[in-house]
Amino acid sequence: MSYAEENELLKMIVETQASRIAEQEATIKELRIMVDELRSLKANLEETLEEFRRQFFGVRSEKTAAPKKEKAETKTVQVKGYTAQRKKKATREELYANLPVREILCTVPDQERKCDWCNAEMVSINAAAFVREEIRITPAKVERIHYMQEVLICPECKKDKDGSFKKGEVPSALIPHSPASASAVAYTMFHKCFMGLPYYRQASLLDQLGAKIPRETLANWCIIASREYLLPVYERLHEELIRREIIHADETTCQVLREEGKAAESTSYMWIYRSGSDGLPTIVMYEYQPGRSGDYPKHFLEGFHGLLQCDCYQGYNKVEDVLLVCCMAHCRRKFYEALPAEKKKSIKLLDINSSEALKEPEIPDTDLEKYIPAEIGVAYCNKLFYLERQLKDLPSEERKVQRLEQEIPVWDHFLNWLDTLKPTKGCKLEKAVNYARNHKDSLRAYLQDGRCEISNNAAERCAKSYAVYRKNSLFHTSVDGANASAIIYSLVETAKANNLNVFQYIYTLLLYMPGCKEGSAGIEHLLPWSAFIKEHCSGLINVESVTVDNHPQLPD
C-alpha cells in the first residue's frame, strides 16, 4: 500500500471516529435533556402529590404552627429585640355592655323575717347588695298577628237611613297576599347571609318553634323583598362606591342550578367589591355573574377612575382608566407553595393585622446554599409585610414617605435576586418567579399611594364570608336567588363593616323602604353611615315595640 493510500485510509478512519464521537455527543446531550425533563417531571409530580395530600389530609390555610427549635448545626439568625404586646383581656362589663339588665331581688321568706332571739320584726339594712350575675337567653318566638279593623258609623245619620263610616288604617302587607312581615323576612335574611344557615335548616328551626314554613316560601320572601325594597339601597351604595378613589376587587365561584343556556353543574361567579382605606365609611358589594369575563368588572366599575386593588387575574385589565394594584399576598403564596412540606412547618407568614408580637424577618445574604430559593422568596415577602405592619397606623402621606424610604431597597434586592434564578421548567418555583417578574410593576404600585394596602386581603375576607354560606348551601337554585343573595350579602357585610347591628339594620330597611322606595331622599337616611341609622341600629332592638305601625319617622 502506497503512502498516499495509507494517508487516505487514516483520514477516513479519523473522519469515521469523529462522526461517531459527534453522534455520541449528540446522543449524550439528548439523554441529558431527557434526564433533566424527567427530573423536572418527577419534581412536578411530587409537588402535585404533596398538594393533593395537603388538600385531603392537611389544613388549607397558609398559617402554620410556631416554628420548632432548630438543630444545633442549623444557622443561628440574630434578630432585633422586641417587646411582646399582649392584648388586654376584656372585662365582663365591656363584653356585656349592650345587654339589657334585669334585677331579681332575692328576699327573705315571710316566715323567716322575725329575729331568732327576740321574735321582733326585722327590717332591711340598706339597698339590696349585688352578689352575682348570669346570662339568660330567650329562644325566638313565632306568633300569628291578626290585624282587626275597627269600623265606626254615625248613629244619628243612621236614623235617617244614611250612614257615615270610618275605618281604622291597616298597615299594608310587606309582600301582597303573603304572611311575611319585616321581622320574619329580616330573620330569614340574617340567618342566611350572616349565620350561613341554608333555607332547609331554617325551615327545620322554625318547625321546632311551631311554624311549618317551607323552604321555598322562605326563598321567595327573600327574593321578592330584595328586589322590591333592598335593591334601591344596593344601587345607591353602588353609586357611592364608584365615586371612591380606591376599590378592592375579587371573585369566587358559585353554582346555579337553573340558568338558561348553562348546565346545572357549570361554574358561575360571585364578584366582590370593597372600598379601600380612604377614611370614608366602608362599602362592600357583591354581584352575581354567570362567568369570569373581564367584561363584568368593566361594566360594574364603569365611571370609576382610581386605584383598583386585585389579584393578577388578567380579566381586570379590561377595566378602563384605572391603575391596577396587585396583591403581594398572592405573590408570597406562590413562593410558600413551592416550599417542601417540612419547610412549611417552620416558616410563619406575617399578618399585618395580627396583634401578635413578631420579630423582624431576616433575609439570608450569606451561606445561601443552606437555603432553598422558595425560602428566600418568602423571606423577602415577609420583610415587606413586616415593614407594612410597622407603618399601618401612620397618616397616608407619612406612610408613603416611609414606604419609599424603607421598602424600595427591599424591592430592589428582591428583583435583582429574582434575575439570578433559573428554576426547573414547570416546577412551582418557576411559577412563583415568573409571577413576580411578570407583575413586578403592579405588585409595587401600592407604593404610589399611602392609602393603598400591600395585599387584597380586605376583599378576600369578604369572599370568605360568602364561601361559608356556599359550603353549607352548595348552590343557588335560580338566578333570581343568586341576585337576591348578592344584594343581601352587600347590605349585611356593609353593616358589619360599619359596626351596625346586622339584624336591626335589615329589619329597619324593611320597615321604612316600603314608604320611600320611589324617592331617593328617604334612602339617604337609610344608608349605613347616616345619623338616623347609627342612632337606631347600633344596639339591640325590640321588635315588639318597633313595628310596622309603630316606629320613628325618618328625618325630613
Walk through the language-model features, giving the residues of each.
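Short, flexible loop/hinge motifs at secondary-structure junctions
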Residues: 1-176, 219, 248-249, 310, ...
